[in-house]
Amino acid sequence: LGKFSQTCYNSAIQGSVLTSTCERTNGGYNTSSIDLNSVIENVDGSLKWQPSNFIETCRNTQLAGSSELAAECKTRAQQFVSTKINLDDHIANIDGTLKYE
């Protein structure tokens, strides 16, 4: 599963969207984007792989290293805490296109 960072480069996060240049099976490259909002949830200040809308309660999203989504997310107590989730766990490069698996 996942492991997009092994074959994708120049990755960046803007809001909830991951964009990367990914290798294709024919040797070429394709720029691809995926909205992580549909697959990641904020659970009391912690990012989890669940369909939701994390961006409504998280801020300052960025890519940490080559594959981690870092953000400040709101807890039930309404305080923002730092959290990360490894996108390589479920985001894959399928012939130049970023996909959730």
Curated annotation (Swiss-Prot):
Cleavage, or reduction and alkylation of the disulfide bonds results in the loss of anti-HIV activity. The keyword Nucleus does not apply. It comes from the Bacteria. Keywords: Antiviral protein, Disulfide bond, Lectin. One of its GO terms (biological process) is regulation of defense response to virus. Pfam families: CVNH. Changing residue 52 to P: Protein is exclusively dimeric and has moderate anti-HIV activity. One of its GO terms (molecular function) is carbohydrate binding. Disulfide bonds join 8-22, 58-73. Overexpression of this protein to provide quantities adequate for medical use as a topical microbiocide has been attempted in a number of systems including E.coli, Lactobacillus jensenii, the yeast Pichia pastoris and Nicotiana tabacum; see PubMed:20162270 for a review. Mannose-binding lectin. Its activity in situ is unknown, however it acts as a viral entry inhibitor, inhibiting HIV-1, HIV-2 and simian immunodeficiency virus (and some other viruses such as feline immunodeficiency virus, measles virus and human herpesvirus) infection and replication. It prevents essential interactions between the envelope glycoprotein and target cell receptors by binding to carbohydrates on viral protein gp120 and possibly by other mechanisms as well. Addition to cells must occur before or shortly after virus addition. Belongs to the cyanovirin-N family. In solution exists as a metastable domain-swapped homodimer which very slowly converts into a more stable monomeric form at room temperature. Under physiological conditions it is unlikely that the dimeric species exists and indeed the monomer is more active against HIV. Interacts with HIV-1 gp120. This is Cyanovirin-N. It comes from Nostoc ellipsosporum.
